[in-house]
Regions:
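N-terminal "arm"/small-domain region of PLP-dependent enzymes with the aminotransferase-like
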Residues: 1-25, 30, 344
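Active-site phosphate-binding strand-loop segment of PLP-dependent enzymes
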Residues: 101-183, 188-190, 195
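PLP-dependent aminotransferase class I/II
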Residues: 33-37, 42-48, 108, 120-124, ...
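Nucleotide-sugar donor-binding loop of glycosyltransferases
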Residues: 71, 77-79, 98, 151, ...
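Helix C-cap/helix->beta junction micro-motif
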Residues: 90, 142-143, 304
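Conserved PLP-anchoring active-site segment centered on the Schiff-base-forming lysine
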Residues: 59-114, 120
Length: 368
């Protein structure tokens, strides 16, 4: 089975993790701060605060921006549920904005959703393809709204020569095993704002900061969102290979792009010339004639050894959100969900693997 994505763990990764386990300090130590420092340097941002998950980092992002009961957050439904869930955890109401054909939030549809209660717009760089963040930031500034870039898919992505993670008030990265690098589980909060970074560090660790010697002060109600030194040792080792990971993913994606050009069964998402995507996902968008056969296609591919996935069921279609918000239908999000199928594209693959995936996909679609 070729999975749609997976981690790549080397002997060096295992060694640094084993070495970290032998250290006296297993959490809150130098490896955490070193990982934060190296990640900030890589992205080109002033502060990185590492946490135990991207969900934790999202929750802290909303809290640090002052999101509270009665505030509204605008975000995309084509994302993992945590993007919206974390806003609810902070007390906000969520308003979902429709997407474009590439799965990213449609910035042209955001203005109609803005009210005096809107506190934050949260964009998601779907599959590693950056959103039109400059347009979103310019819109937000006109209304006094803050912007979060949920870049969980996009560590290492570049747009107009600038790495993702620099422009928004806060950017979020994920280190889940299928993401560009892994710390087993983990996430990060990135910002150029000193005060937001100070608040994030407090929220990460119970709202407590040391004052002198043994003494400390709890100045706000925080959480235990700390990440371990063992996890960060793995993160440091993986970060050294990130550019190579992305290059390999792009090699596989380039093969697909060429192989699927003019395909009669589906379309692919074109990455703009000014962009280097992390290629966290390689989505194919099935033609409408296949939508009602998608489960059959999915099962057939799995049986033939091609691991596929769907990214994503619109968040508002979950029963929890239906009970909370009632029935919602955003036409482009619905179409995207009906069409989307993520095929294997990761740095553990060879071009021969990609050839097998492509030929198997064609075989299944021609016989369904």
């Amino acid at each position: 089975m070729i999975p749609y994505s997976r981690q790549q763990i080397t002997e060096e990764d295992i060694k640094v993790v084993a070495d970290a386990l032998r250290d006296d300090i297993l959490t809150g130590g130098e490896k955490v701060s070193k990982f934060e420092e190296e990640l900030a340097k890589y992205v080109g941002v002033k502060h990185v605060i590492a946490m135990n998950s991207a969900t934790s980092a999202l929750h802290v992002a909303y809290l640090s921006l002052g999101v509270k009961d009665g505030d509204e957050v605008i975000t995309t439904p084509i994302t993992f549920a945590a993007t919206a869930n974390a806003a609810l955890m902070a007390g906000a109401q969520v308003k979902f904005c429709d997407v474009k054909a590439n799965g990213n939030i449609d910035e042209e549809k955001i203005p109609a959703l803005i009210t005096p209660k809107t506190k934050v717009i949260t964009a998601v760089d779907y599959g590693g393809n950056p959103v039109e963040l400059d347009k979103i930031i310019n819109l937000a500034k006109k209304h006094g709204i803050k912007v979060i870039d949920d870049a969980s898919h996009a560590l290492g992505s570049v747009q107009n020569g600038v790495k993702v993670g620099v422009k928004a008030d806060i950017s979020i990265f994920s280190f889940h095993p299928v993401k560009p690098i892994t710390t087993l589980e983990g996430g990060a909060f990135a910002t150029n704002d000193d005060e937001l970074a100070r608040l994030a560090r407090l929220y990460r660790s119970h709202g407590i900061a040391k004052t002198k010697l043994w003494d400390s002060d709890m100045s706000l109600l925080g959480y235990n969102y700390r990440i371990t030194d063992v996890a960060c040792a793995l993160g440091l080792s993986q970060l050294k290979r990130l550019d190579g990971f992305i290059a390999k993913r792009n090699e596989i994606a380039k093969f697909y792009d060429e192989k699927f050009s003019g395909c009669e069964y589906f379309k692919t998402i074109k990455i703009p010339a000014n962009t280097t995507s992390s290629r966290h996902l390689y989505p194919v968008l099935l033609d409408e004639e296949f939508w009602d056969k998608k489960e059959q296609i999915f099962e057939a591919l799995l049986q033939k050894g091609v691991g596929v996935q769907v990214h994503y069921k619109p968040t508002y279609k979950f029963s929890f959100y239906k009970a909370l918000l009632g029935e919602i239908s955003l036409p482009n999000a619905e179409k995207f969900y009906s069409a989307e199928l993520s095929i294997p594209c990761h740095h553990g693959m060879s071009v021969d693997d990609a050839k097998f995936v492509a030929s198997t996909l064609f075989d299944v679609l021609s016989n369904v």
